[in-house]
Amino acid sequence: MTQTSKSVAEAFERASYPIPGHGPRDIQVLKEALDAYDGGLSSDKYGEGAIIEPFQERMARMLGKPAAVFFPSGTMAQQIALRIWCDAAGSKKVAYHPLSHLELHEKDGVRELHHLEPILIGDRSRPVVLADLQQLEEDVACVLLELPQREIGGQLPAYEELVKMSAYCREKGIRLHLDGARLFECLPHYGKTAAEICELFDSVYVSFYKGIGGVAGAILAGDLELTEPSTIWKRRHGGDLISLYPYILSAEYYMDRRLPLMDRYRREAQELAALYNECHAVSTTPIVPPTNMFHVRVNMPKERLEPIIVAVVEETGFGFTSYLREEKDGGCMFEVSIGDRYAELPKDQLREAFRALDRRLNPSAGRQL
């Protein structure tokens, strides 16, 4: 890590009012959750017991699937889902977006561990649509769709497009898997329940540490054709730990607390994105976020932007981001995810912080937000 990137992170750490997220990812996250439960509660053991089984049943009902299996990580859960669907079809080919988590962040796990052959579909700048599936020149066992698409700012396809893609895959005998790491965050936009969205898919993965803000863990849901072999693969991957209750209880605790707030987070993200879009040389992707997340892009090189952000943090106390990522065209970007923090921010001071940011980005303008 360079010295300049440290300065942004350090400024964010010193900020009186960090803007994104729920709060620090410290051990208080787990402690708060565990304090809500009776300390005499028996723990789960190797995938069985009074904690894990009721939670899996609850998630299966919530997602509208016959069964669900708790995993320590989504990386494990999704690779296993794709492997099972490929084995069932007698094919090694799967299709997903070029900016899928499997392609960018898993060290080629589907290739190296499972010897699958990913086919990248769609444009890097937008979600997958029906036309992308229709243009596939090879037969595939499974298509993976991510809702929302994190690496392009949380963009979502239209619900009608999802319905068309689901119908197309079923007609062609292709399994459709949902990377729903942030599924709950997109439900207010669609105006649908989790079960209504998941009905379009053969299998679904959901994360418990992103918008929900738990410690870690994931659920994989589908019919028994998927879930029964997934427990075997979970053991093969080393994921069948003697106990997973710290993950499960924190998932349950924060899910109950934050699922009712997802629409609020979305509206707050839209409010914040509007403030960013009023600033000189700044734009968000999407312009109007459909979920609680978006990307901020600044048309300025990192060596110029970084001291500006640090100065505004020190002047106003508001922390915008803990990092900047340089883009190939010379600009910078960072991701924003709205959580519990935003509602507690003093909004008049927040607007003044954005005025200060705008002034420093464009000293000659001096316009008002």
Located regions from the model:
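Active-site phosphate-binding strand-loop segment of PLP-dependent enzymes
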Residues: R126-G180
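Conserved C-terminal alpha-helix-loop-beta "cap" of PLP-dependent enzymes
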Residues: T2-Q3, A281-L369
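Hydrophobic beta-strand scaffold residues
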Residues: E117-P118, L176-L178, F320
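PLP-dependent aminotransferase-like
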Residues: C86-A141
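Conserved N-terminal alpha-helix of the aminotransferase class I/II PLP-enzyme fold
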Residues: S5, P18-S73, D87, P98-E103, ...
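Active-site C-terminal subdomain of aminotransferase-like
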Residues: E151, L156, E199-H280, T284-T291, ...
